[in-house]
């Protein structure tokens, strides 16, 4: 009986942050600037701006894909908070975003995101 309870608890932990899906985006020069034109300096801000450009301003790069999670400003603010957490992006991923125009994949989970570089 104790083993069954432990297995149930472990299964619950494993599903605590289920993957919802992913999308691919090119973080281009237009994503390095805020909507009002000032330069952004952080990778999390740039990934958030990419989603604003996709959903709100319809300024899309040819490599960009849509997503079902970051349509509103509040959802994009949540995205930025998740991107700023440890483990969301490696330091090399952050540098690639800030210093270039990489193609990224964003894996979206219930309570977190993870960003990886597909093409630098």
Which residues are covered by each model-predicted region?
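Bacterial N-terminal signal peptides
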Residues: 2-9
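Sec/Tat signal peptide C-region and signal peptidase I cleavage site
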Residues: 10-17
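Short, exposed beta-strand-loop hairpins at the edges of beta-sheets
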Residues: 95-119
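Short N-terminal segments immediately surrounding and downstream of signal-peptide cleavage
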Residues: 17-31
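Mature extracytoplasmic domains of secretory-pathway proteins
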Residues: 37-92
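Generic structural motif
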Residues: 30-32, 86, 109-111, 120
């Amino acid at each position: 009986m104790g083993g069954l309870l432990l297995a149930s608890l472990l299964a619950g932990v494993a599903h605590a942050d289920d993957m919802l899906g992913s999308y691919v985006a090119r973080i281009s020069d237009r994503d390095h600037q805020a909507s009002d034109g000032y330069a952004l300096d952080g990778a999390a801000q740039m990934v958030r701006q990419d989603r604003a450009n996709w959903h709100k301003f319809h300024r899309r790069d040819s490599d960009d894909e849509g997503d079902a999670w970051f349509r509103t400003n509040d959802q994009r603010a949540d995205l930025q908070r998740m991107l700023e957490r440890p483990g969301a992006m490696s330091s090399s991923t952050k540098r690639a975003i800030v210093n270039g125009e990489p193609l990224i994949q964003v894996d979206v989970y219930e309570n977190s995101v993870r960003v990886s570089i597909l093409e630098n």
